[in-house]
C-alpha cells in the first residue's frame, strides 16, 4: 500500500498578491471581467504545477475562490439573497461580489452579507443566509470548470467540496425563524448532481470538508450526518475531512458513515493514531494531517515519522497538511531579508508540500536520513540564544496573584479618577486611530525605504499628531487620542518594538476577499528593550490640557494575530507580552498619561472550538490583561476596547478584566448588545459605540441621541461614555469631522437635558 501526499488546499492570492490586485482593479472599473478571469486561470495553473513539482501526488481542485470558499458554495447551491439577485435570475461573478462586499461593477448595490471568522482562524467567511422554504439548484459551475481545467493540464486531482452539514451549520436564518437543519434534504440533490458530474469526469476521490465534526454539536446535528451521507454515497470515493481539532469525541458518528476515508488534524487535535487505526473500518483510508497548515514553522519530520510509522502497511494511508495551506504564506524562498538562522526554522506553503514528499518517501522506503537532515535546524533551534531569555523566563516564573490585582476595587478607583479628570456627564472620546491619509502612509513608506531620514520622519509624524489634537479640540471632545499616525497596524507596530518577534517581507495570508495580512512571527521569549508609545503620547499630551489616552494593543490580541511559537503554550506567550506591556503602562503613567487604553478585540475570537475548553483559556486570557494593567495607580484610568457581536457567554470574563471603562461595538445592533451588560449588572463604565465607522454615512444628532437614551435605559447614565464603534483609520477626514461633531452635539444636548 503506497502512501500518497495531498494538501487540503493552497493559498489563492498569488506570491505577489496578484489576485488581490486583479480583484481591486476590476472593482474599480480599471480592468475587464475577462482580465480578472484570466488572472484566476493563471494562478490556478501555476499553483497546481508548483504543488506537483514539490511532490504532491493528488492536487486539490475547488480550493480557489474569488472571495471566499463558503460564498462559492452558496453560489454552487443557488443560495443568493434576494437583494443581490440579477433580474433574470442568472448568477455571475458580480453576484458573488455583491454578496461579499455589497457592490460590484454591475447590478444594484445592496447590503453585503455578514462576515465572520472561519472557526478559530484569522480567515473570514461570508455567512450563508437561509429563509424558510427557499429552493436550491446548481447555478454556479466553477468547481466543474476548474476540474476540467486541471484534467486538461494532465493533473491527478482531488476535488474539494464544503460538506452539506457544515455548510448549514455556518449559516444564519433570516426572516421568519425556523430550524435551518430542515434544509438538508433540499440541498442534498445539488450535492448529488455535483458528485455525478465529477464521476462522469473520471474523478476517483472527492475531499468533502465537514469541520463541524470537531465541535460539540447538538445531537440533532450529529444525527443528520448519517442520512446526508447515505444520500451522497456511491458515485465517487469520499474523503470525509476534518480540521482545527480532534475527532475522537464524535468518532462513533463518523465511523457509521458510508465514506471511504477520513482526514484528521493531528496537529491541533489530541487524537491518538493507534486508537484511530483500531476504531476506523479496516477498508477506510486514513489521511494523516501531520504538517501544520496554520503556521510558518519547519516540521521536525523525525517526530512525524515516529507518530505514524506504526500503522504503515496496515491500512491505506495518505500524508497531508493538517488543514488548507490557505493560512500559511506561499514561498519562503523569496524571503531574502530574513536572517539565515531564523529562515532555517521556517517552512511556508510550498516548503510544507516538500515536507510531505520527504515524509512520504521515508514512510514508503523506511529510509530516514533525509528526514534527519531536514529536521536538524528546528532541533538546533531548541538551544538557540535567540529563543531563550533567562531574565524573561525568571520574571514569568515569579508572577504572583498580586501581580494581576489593581491596588483597590473599581469603586475606590472611580472616585480617584473623577477627582483627577473632572469629566462632564456623557464624556466623549474616540477609540484611538484617526484617518490614515495618503500623506501619512507616504511618510511611513518613504522612511521605511530609506528615502527619508529619522529627523524628517519624526517631524512629519509630530505634525500629524498636532493636527489630530487641534481637530479634536475644535470638535470639543473630552478625552483625546494622538491618532496613531506612526502605526501601520495595531499588532505589527508593537511586534516591531518587542524582542522575540520577526517580520517577513512577503509573508501575506488572506483574511477575506482581497484583504491580506502579514502576521508577525513569535520566535522566542518576548521582552521590551525600550519604551514604545511613550514619546508620542507625551508629545500629544503636551499640546493640550485635556487628557490624552495612551494606546496599547493587548497581549491576547497580539498573540492571536501573530504566528505563535510551537515550543511553548499560548498562555506563556500571552503572559510574556503582558509583562512587557506592563512596563509600558508604568512608563506612560510616569510620563503623565492618566488614561491608558489596552485593546483586546481578539479575546473572544481566541476561544477554543469546544466550550469545555473555554474556562482554561479565559482564565489565562483575563490574567494576561490584568498583569498588563494592574501596575496602574488608582487615579490612572484603564480602558479596553472590544468589537464583538456576542458577549452573553463570556460576561464573567469581561467583568473579570476589571477595566475602568470598556468601549464596545453596538451601533449596528441598535444597543441590543447592552442587554448582556444590563442582565449581568456590569459594575464599571461602558462606552457603547454610537455610530458604525465601517460606513461613510454620517449619523444625525437625533439618531445618536436616541441611541444614547436607549443605552441609558439599560446602564446608569453616570457610567456611560460616548464614542464611535471602532477606530477611524479607514475613514476620510470630511465624514470623520461631521460624524464626531454630531456625536459631541448629542452628548451636549443630553447634559443640558438633565
Swiss-Prot record:
Cofactor: Zn(2+)
Keyword Amino-acid biosynthesis found: yes
Superkingdom of origin organism: Bacteria
Record-linked SUPFAM superfamilies: UROD/MetE-like
Binding site for Zn(2+): 641, 643, 665, 726
InterPro entries: Cbl-indep_Met_Synth_N, Cobalamin-indep_Met_synthase, Met_Synth_C/arc, UROD/MetE-like_sf
The UniProt record lists the keyword Amino-acid biosynthesis: yes
Residue stretches spanning the membrane: none
List of catalytic residues: 694 (proton donor)
Positions bound to L-methionine: 431-433, 484, 599
Residues the entry annotates as binding L-homocysteine: 431-433, 484, 599
Cofactor, free-text remark: Binds 1 zinc ion per subunit.
Pathway: Amino-acid biosynthesis; L-methionine biosynthesis via de novo pathway; L-methionine from L-homocysteine (MetE route): step 1/1
Binding positions (5-methyltetrahydropteroyltri-L-glutamate): 17-20, 117, 515-516, 561, 605
Catalytic reactions on record: 5-methyltetrahydropteroyltri-L-glutamate + L-homocysteine = tetrahydropteroyltri-L-glutamate + L-methionine
Top class in the EC scheme: transferase
GO molecular function: 5-methyltetrahydropteroyltriglutamate-homocysteine S-methyltransferase activity; zinc ion binding
Keywords noted in UniProt: Amino-acid biosynthesis, Metal-binding, Methionine biosynthesis, Methyltransferase, Repeat, Transferase, Zinc
Functional summary from the UniProt entry: Catalyzes the transfer of a methyl group from 5-methyltetrahydrofolate to homocysteine resulting in methionine formation.
Protein name: 5-methyltetrahydropteroyltriglutamate--homocysteine methyltransferase
The organism of origin for this protein: Salmonella gallinarum (strain 287/91 / NCTC 13346)
